[in-house]
Amino acid sequence: MKGFYRLLFILTLLFQFNGNAQITPSPIKNSKVIVIYGSPDCHYCIDLKKTLVDQNKNFVFYDIDTNKVALNEMLTKLSRAKISTTNLQIPVVDKYGVMYVNSANFKDFVEKIVE
């Protein structure tokens, strides 16, 4: 029985450290990288990513549905920028330290990101 508990303890430690490594957003070394917070099923997120690829822009996408660390990072950045999270629409973009949220006019939002 002691062996079972030792094995359970070791497996718990292994999965705990592996799980944390997978969900932590890596720091962006290059300040010329656009960070997108969104959902892989969001049509606005899909359209924005396609536009950035077409425009040859560097970006990183974080799925805030599954990555709670990225979600908290996004909320912290919005709070620091004094942007309300009430009725927030995705995608949310950090473009070189300036935060942008999806507005009523998606075309204008995308133009701000790609310019």
Give residue spans per PLM region:
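Structural micro-motif
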Residues: 81-94
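Non-catalytic, surface beta->alpha helical segment in thiol-disulfide oxidoreductase systems
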Residues: 94-115
